């Protein structure tokens, strides 16, 4: 991009986003008006600026100047000074007062304000107090202007520069030059990598103490994104050495200091030193304690429970098998129960019977699941209202950033109910489990339901698996495939996959198909035909309801390539559809998209077709999908309708948290259910291409599974029971609590 420079004064501001500073304004340049767009720090009408950027042609609004950076210039002639002071930029000065000030001090006005502010009292209508207030405002604007220039010379964009200035004010000079790594802790949007680049520019040594400490914490943060709550010391050191380019002894020398600063916790287990980020250690430890506190027993005679079960069976015309009946009994007798089982094993019937039992006892029951889709499905199968765990806990938007959850319901304001049933527990990570348990008081029954053979949560921890593996709590495993489920080859084959048994690929099934193709492009062509022509009629659904699931993000059959191809096929470019390009991805009106990061501060609304708001709240979560309804370049937002009809005005600045969702990774699909799924399949890394992944993909389909690809890879995945190691200590914490 060839940068151009324009100089002029701000005639008027058309639009300004107070949250991120995005502004559309009219700049008068050589007596001609020019529309400028960009992020402006605290700019006001009447100000003189020198702007750097490029001319662009907007499809709707015509010629614009897209500003990359700018500097405010003090007005040089008396007319410009008067225009600036009277513009409203300085609170308390109107047009008449501005004229009197300039008439008195002429071109010397700004020097007087900055160096001899008390002299402003010479002007009629200005007291000594008001004179100092005016000077303070002018000086604050000068400080901000100088800070912006200072930060931009280090490559910091204007949006981030405003955040940094708002956090540190005049301290930014010392922070940036002495320890820029503070920013990674203090400011959302500044991670270790950004701070490290800034540190290199200002000459911070690569082996400085605060760089190594910050690097260690960054490695633990990245490990959490991979699902780990801790790393063994040897592994942490290896990763930190690779990241920082220093010696292992230099890394190890900082562990004790970080522990003393309460940034990390070091735990010795079986001769291995486990190193936790402080937060995750205490989440695991307190989760174990709270689980044990809920694990109480209730003395209810078997004969009484069995009589109630028979009564419910008679009314519902459903008969429980012995494991289901045992689950109901355990739910009545225990404060904490885990129910696990694969598809078609009667989890829903069991949950419904438990609900009806407690309902007959006059007890209040809350139902919840980790995602909106899972909660909706729970509502449909039980006939009772189910909410997301976040909504049940009354998410309040969290702390200072978009990625930290805060809930109204906690130990000081617990959930007021007798029974809580959580479905799809395999998706619950340690952070959400900790928040849930804080809001559950002793005496409340907690029933955790899930399929332990599904992939673990996207977030850190292996909560369901660790709870079961601890052996500390009552657990009922449902194994029988019921008659109505046994007619579905999706369910039958899912269990065969889970057990490592051979699956027939003769395509004689009514809901499970394998189309053999061995070339990526041929696989893609078949996938397109299935989505556009075959499957919508076969499963009575729209093409948007059919989901492509793939093991990987990269590669010929990865999410990134498939989404570009599927978008062009399903939602091609059209003059009537507005678009927004972001880092190589085109987002278009009508696109299917997915949120890829928890954001607890995005506001949403549910409205009727007449525009009446019937519900509103906060939070869009990792894995939530939606459709882009409208793109507004002027406001720099797009309207997205997410699951459950939640409409969001999604700002462009958050587009790094959004991606196309015509194809998604199997891991991201966890907890969702689709009428039909298409799984393109070729060989890949052994640790990824395993039984667990294939089982999860197949169980996402309600009516039809179609796998397109190499049958050898399919069979190898069934036989490959290896899984990537996930470092999680909840099981050990629970065992310690029971000793």
Go through each PLM region and give its residues.
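Structural detector for short beta-strands of small beta-barrel domains
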Residues: 2-17, 53, 625-629
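Short aromatic-glycine-enriched beta-strand elements
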Residues: 16-27, 634-640
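Accessory alpha-helical DNA-binding modules that contact the DNA backbone or grooves
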Residues: 22-30, 35-36, 44-54, 59-273, ...
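Pre-P-loop entry segment of helicase/translocase ATPase cores
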Residues: 152, 221-222, 266-326
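Conserved RecA-like ASCE P-loop NTPase motor core of nucleic-acid helicases/translocases
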Residues: 337-379, 449, 512-517, 534-555
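Conserved helicase motor core of SF1/SF2 NTP-dependent helicases
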Residues: 353, 357-363, 372-379, 390-398, ...
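Conserved helicase motor core of P-loop NTPases
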Residues: 452-618
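C-terminal accessory regions
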Residues: 614-617, 622-739
């Amino acid at each position: 991009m060839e940068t151009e420079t324009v100089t002029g004064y701000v005639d008027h501001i058309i639009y300004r986003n107070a949250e991120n500073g995005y502004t559309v304004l009219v700049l008068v340049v050589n007596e001609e008006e020019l529309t400028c767009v960009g992020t402006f720090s605290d700019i006001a009408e009447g100000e003189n600026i020198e702007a750097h950027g490029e001319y662009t042609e907007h499809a709707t609004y015509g010629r614009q100047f897209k500003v990359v950076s700018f500097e405010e210039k003090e007005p040089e002639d008396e007319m410009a000074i008067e225009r600036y002071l009277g513009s409203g930029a300085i609170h308390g000065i109107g047009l008449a007062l501005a004229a009197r000030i300039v008439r008195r001090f002429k071109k010397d006005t700004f020097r007087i304000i900055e160096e001899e502010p008390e002299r402003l009292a010479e002007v009629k209508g200005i007291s000594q107090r008001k004179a100092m207030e005016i000077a303070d405002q002018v000086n604050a604007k000068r400080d901000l202007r100088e800070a912006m220039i200072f930060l931009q010379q280090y490559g910091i964009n204007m949006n981030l520069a405003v955040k940094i200035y708002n956090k540190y004010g005049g301290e930014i000079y010392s922070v940036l030059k002495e320890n820029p790594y503070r920013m990674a802790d203090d400011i959302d949007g500044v991670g270790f990598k950004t701070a490290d680049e800034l540190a290199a520019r200002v000459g911070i040594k690569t082996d400085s103490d605060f760089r190594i400490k910050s690097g260690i914490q960054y490695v633990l943060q990245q490990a959490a994104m991979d699902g780990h709550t801790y790393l063994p010391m040897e592994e942490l050191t290896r990763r930190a050495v690779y990241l920082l380019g220093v010696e292992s002894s230099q890394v190890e020398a900082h562990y004790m200091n970080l522990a003393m600063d309460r940034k990390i916790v070091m735990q010795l287990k079986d001769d291995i030193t486990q190193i936790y980020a402080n937060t995750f250690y205490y989440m695991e430890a307190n989760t174990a304690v709270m689980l044990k506190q809920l694990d109480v027993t209730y003395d209810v005679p078997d004969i009484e429970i069995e009589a109630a079960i028979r009564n419910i069976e008679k009314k519902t015309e459903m008969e429980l098998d012995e494991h289901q009946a045992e689950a109901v009994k355990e739910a009545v007798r225990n404060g904490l129960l885990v129910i696990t089982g694969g598809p078609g094993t009667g989890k829903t019937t069991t949950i419904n019977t438990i609900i009806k039992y407690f309902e007959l006892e006059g007890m209040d029951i809350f139902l919840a699941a980790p995602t909106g889709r899972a909660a909706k499905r729970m509502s449909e199968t039980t006939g009772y209202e189910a909410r997301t765990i976040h909504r049940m806990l009354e998410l309040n938007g969290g702390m200072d950033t978009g990625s930290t959850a805060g809930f109204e319901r906690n130990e000081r304001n617990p959930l007021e109910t007798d029974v809580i049933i959580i479905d799809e527990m395999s998706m619950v990570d340690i952070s959400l489990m900790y928040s849930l348990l804080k809001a559950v008081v002793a005496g409340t029954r907690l029933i955790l339901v899930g399929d332990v053979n599904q992939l673990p949560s996207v977030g850190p921890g292996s909560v369901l698996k660790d709870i079961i593996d601890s052996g500390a709590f009552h657990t009922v495993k449902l194994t029988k495939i019921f008659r109505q489920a046994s007619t579905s080859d999706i369910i039958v084959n899912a269990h065969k996959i889970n057990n490592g048994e051979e699956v027939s690929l003769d395509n004689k099934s009514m809901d499970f198909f394998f189309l053999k193709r061995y070339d990526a492009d041929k696989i893609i062509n078949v996938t397109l035909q299935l989505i556009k022509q075959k499957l919508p009629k076969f499963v009575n659904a729209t093409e948007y309801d059919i989901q492509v699931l793939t093991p990987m993000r990269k590669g010929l059959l990865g999410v990134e390539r498939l989404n570009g191809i599927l978008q062009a096929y399903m939602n091609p470019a059209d003059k009537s559809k507005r678009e927004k390009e972001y880092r190589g991805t085109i987002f278009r009106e009508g696109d299917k998209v997915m949120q890829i990061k928890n954001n607890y501060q995005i506001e949403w609304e549910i409205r009727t077709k007449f525009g009446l708001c019937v519900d509103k709240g906060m939070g869009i979560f990792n894995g939530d999908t939606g459709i882009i309804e409208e793109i507004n370049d002027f406001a720099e937002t797009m309207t997205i309708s997410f699951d459950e009809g939640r409409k969001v005005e999604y700002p462009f600045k958050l587009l790094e948290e959004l991606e196309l969702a015509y194809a998604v990774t199997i891991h991201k699909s966890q907890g969702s259910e689709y009428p039909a799924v298409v799984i393109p399949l070729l060989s890949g890394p052994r640790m990824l291409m395993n039984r667990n992944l294939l089982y999860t993909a197949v169980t996402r389909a309600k009516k039809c599974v179609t796998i397109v690809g190499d049958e050898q890879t399919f069979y190898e995945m069934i036989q490959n029971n290896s899984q990537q190691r996930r470092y999680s200590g909840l099981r050990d914490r629970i065992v310690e609590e029971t000793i």
